């Protein structure tokens, strides 16, 4: 895992097309902004896990 330190307003690049910007810090919460192409899915981890769980469940009609 790469660990980086960023200040509010600073950005990091993931590849050529994805940017992650620190928008603010309040207490133990960090607000980040993600810019990515439409074809790149961006989810919070708990939402991503829910999507994956729903995909693995058999569909009943």
Swiss-Prot record:
Compartment annotation: Cytoplasm
Highest taxon above the source species: Bacteria
GO molecular function: mRNA 5'-UTR binding
InterPro entries: CsrA, CsrA_sf
UniProt keyword annotations, A-Z: Activator, Cytoplasm, Repressor, RNA-binding, Translation regulation
GO cellular component annotations of the record: cytosol
Chief localization: cytoplasm
Binding partners and assembly: Homodimer; the beta-strands of each monomer intercalate to form a hydrophobic core while the alpha-helices form wings that extend away from the core.
Known role: A key translational regulator that binds mRNA to regulate translation initiation and/or mRNA stability. Mediates global changes in gene expression, shifting from rapid growth to stress survival by linking envelope stress, the stringent response and the catabolite repression systems. Usually binds in the 5'-UTR; binding at or near the Shine-Dalgarno sequence prevents ribosome-binding, repressing translation, binding elsewhere in the 5'-UTR can activate translation and/or stabilize the mRNA. Its function is antagonized by small RNA(s).
Family: Belongs to the CsrA/RsmA family.
Name listed for the protein in its UniProt record: Translational regulator CsrA
